[in-house]
Regions:
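GNAT-family acyltransferases
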Residues: 1-130, 143, 188-193, 197-231
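Conserved GNAT acetyl-CoA-binding A-motif
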Residues: 146-156
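Conserved beta-strand-loop-alpha-helix junction that forms the acyl-donor binding cleft
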Residues: 155-164
Length: 231
């Protein structure tokens, strides 16, 4: 650990201490899905299905938002999403069906520190636990580290939301700790678990994602041959 002229330990100097960029992208193209900047005109009809018409009410338990009660409420929400630059919202289009089956966002965007959080994840049942869902996360990670030049990618969740925590760990996020009494929402107290990926970890994670997503990693029934952790 380097020392300053007072003989105090300090963090390592950075070769590049510049600010990162704000997200500004229309399309990230993958093999199984595309990640598209969310717009009402392009995505409202498909999103309405899993946000309202056939929404799973339990999906909203750990979200700050409540379930939608009308089509108009969904439209208003998506109009707000489209205009927002922090969070910056995306739709996930499944290539097999051609339908938008999920949304997520880059949030808590801090260009000065080159730090950003993945959040607001809502996936239709047809997208959950699929290659397309994993590829969508990979595409956005790649964009964050390689195009935006960020150093830190965060994932936070209610400490009781085990599916979210398990997803973070599977995707390669490292558990950092728990913020107790971190938030109040829906009349409840929330302890928040924090996870992250940092830029030095990205090259190995990228290799792991690409090995897992390769067509030869799946059999004729679409079952994986090696888990993401083992790739």
């Amino acid at each position: 650990m380097p020392l300053n002229h007072y003989q105090q330990e300090v963090g390592p100097s950075l070769a590049d201490a510049s600010s990162g960029k704000m997200p500004d992208v229309a399309l990230l193209e993958g093999r199984y899905c595309s990640v598209e900047h969310l717009t009402v005109a392009e995505h409202y009809k498909d999103i309405l299905d899993f946000y309202f018409t056939n929404q799973i009410l339990s999906d909203w338990t750990y979200m700050y938002a409540d379930p939608f009660e009308s089509e108009e409420a969904v439209r208003q929400c998506l109009e707000d999403y489209e205009q927002s630059d922090n969070p910056y919202f995306f739709a996930i289009r499944d290539k097999a069906s051609g339908k938008v089956l999920g949304t997520f966002s880059l949030m808590a965007i801090t260009p000065k520190n080159r730090s950003v959080e993945m959040g607001r994840v809502i996936l239709a049942p047809a997208l959950q636990k699929t290659r397309a869902a994993t590829e969508a996360q990979y595409l956005l990670m790649k964009y964050v580290f390689e195009d935006l030049n960020y150093r830190r990618y965060e994932w936070k969740c209610d400490s009781l939301n085990r599916p979210s925590a398990n997803a973070a760990m599977r995707l390669g996020f490292t558990y950092e700790g728990r913020f107790r009494n971190h938030a109040i929402y829906k009349g409840r107290s929330r302890d928040t678990d924090w996870f992250s990926i940092i830029d030095s970890e990205w090259p190995r994670l990228k290799e792991r994602f690409e090995n897992w997503l390769a067509p030869e990693n799946f059999d004729e029934q679409g079952q994986q041959k090696r888990s993401l952790r083992d790739c």
